[in-house]
Amino acid sequence: MAKVAGFRFELKQLFHLMWPILITQFAQAGLGLIDTIMAGHLSANDLAAIAVGVGLWMPVMLLFSAIMIATTPLVAEAKGARTPEHIPVIVRQSLWVAVSLGVIAMLILQLMPFLLPILGVPESLQPKAGLFLHAIGFGMPAVTMYAALRGYSEALGYPRPVTVISLLALVVLVPLNYIFMYGIGPVPHLGSAGCGFATAILQWLMLITLASYIYRAKAYQSTQVFSHWERINLTLVKRILKLGLPIGLAVFFEVSIFSTGAIVLSPLGDTLVAAHQIAMSVTSQLFMIPMSLAIALTIRVGMYYGEKNWVSMRLVQKLGLATATFFAMCTMSLIWFARPQIVAIYTQDPAVFDIALYLLLFAMAYQLMDAWQVGAAGCLRGMQDTKGPMWITLIAYWVVAFPVGTYLARVAKMGPAGVWLGLITGLSIACVLLLMRLYRNNHKLAQQS
């Protein structure tokens, strides 16, 4: 009979996993900030070209790297089932999938410059944005393989190596950007393309560093991934893709809906778009907290799922959602009491300032729903239920949130408030449906036992 986990023990385990993951998320966001700051010192044209390139690269990168999240619940399940011999096989096959997906993503990014005229990107930006996409695309195989190894390390309960590498990447990116963007010695001035090359090189360096650490560190020796290689196992590859593709699409649906607000509002003027982007930037930073908790929940739930310890699994879920509630209340309080100070970091323009201040009230309103829905999604991934959540996110965000937000913003003349009401509606529906699905899955498992 499986031993039931204690409340304090499980809370400690969640925080042990969550905090390094949270630091990793902030460090990765810092990489984008460094690119923006250094590109801004080149020229406004270079900065705009990189912004366009990142806008196209980011969805592709998130889609393909999110597919590799499947490694996490599979490794956690094998750990919980006490079958460590299965773990290296899972990771090796995940790396085969990662290489294949990385090459596909790289080819997509090489072709993307041809879409720039179709997307209405100004001719003045097309050459530099195209070169940026060509350059950064070479890093995609490293991105997907790194995601697979990261999932393996975190699922074993070792998130700190990834955190340290992410923090080191912040330090390394500055000189890399300087060398390739501004030129030094034999390296010519490459401008925005140099930013893409620097990021791609950094991604390969991060992969090599993590792989080297996993190869050498004692903690991984019992499940040594690199002891030998093996051929592609189509059965396991299909299982990885069956689990991972819905995760990737769900992440894509969620991320893309939040990036459409600026497009919907663009005909209504720069001031509204700027205010909307400020509010969106604030919520994106705050979202890293429940997202990091959700990754920790996937690991702990996945372990108990493999162990078939349903009582402890439900305890983790309840504890995770309670923790998500606590953090949501904290972020709501932060927004309520510090709105003026937060907006002042972004702008001093009076018109933009007032609208952003108003929009942060909508951001505050959905913190709880957002925390619950991402927490429930993390639990479901741990239970290897990914197809249902994919359809839920598609319906909630693109069948409901997008049309409702567009109608309220443009037809009902509500402007950015309409977009945010649409997002709140979609998030609320996703939250309710994901929690219902989690309850249903738990009820089924309870009946089976």
Curated annotation (Swiss-Prot):
Provide an example Pfam family for this protein.
MatE
The subcellular localization recorded is: Cell inner membrane
| GO terms of biological process kind | monoatomic ion transport
What CDD domains does its record include? MATE_NorM_like
* Superkingdom: Bacteria
Which keywords appear in this protein's UniProt record, sorted alphabetically? Antiport, Cell inner membrane, Cell membrane, Ion transport, Membrane, Transmembrane, Transmembrane helix, Transport
Mind telling me which GO cellular component terms the entry cites?
plasma membrane
Q: List the transmembrane segments.
A: 17-39, 54-76, 97-119, 129-151, 164-186, 196-215, 243-265, 280-302, 315-337, 352-369, 390-412, 417-439
Keyword Transport (UniProt)? yes
Q: Among its keywords, does the record have Cell membrane?
A: yes
Q: Which GO terms describe its molecular function?
A: antiporter activity; xenobiotic transmembrane transporter activity
Q: Which InterPro entries match?
A: MATE_fam, MATE_MdtK, MdtK-like
What's its membrane topology?
Multi-pass membrane protein
Q: Which PANTHER family match?
A: FMN_FAD EXPORTER YEEO-RELATED, MULTIDRUG RESISTANCE PROTEIN NORM-RELATED
Described purpose of this protein according to its UniProt entry: Multidrug efflux pump.
Q: Which family does it belong to?
A: Belongs to the multi antimicrobial extrusion (MATE) (TC 2.A.66.1) family.
NCBIfam families per the UniProt record, alphabetical: matE
Q: What is this protein called?
A: Probable multidrug resistance protein NorM
Q: Which gene encodes it?
A: norM
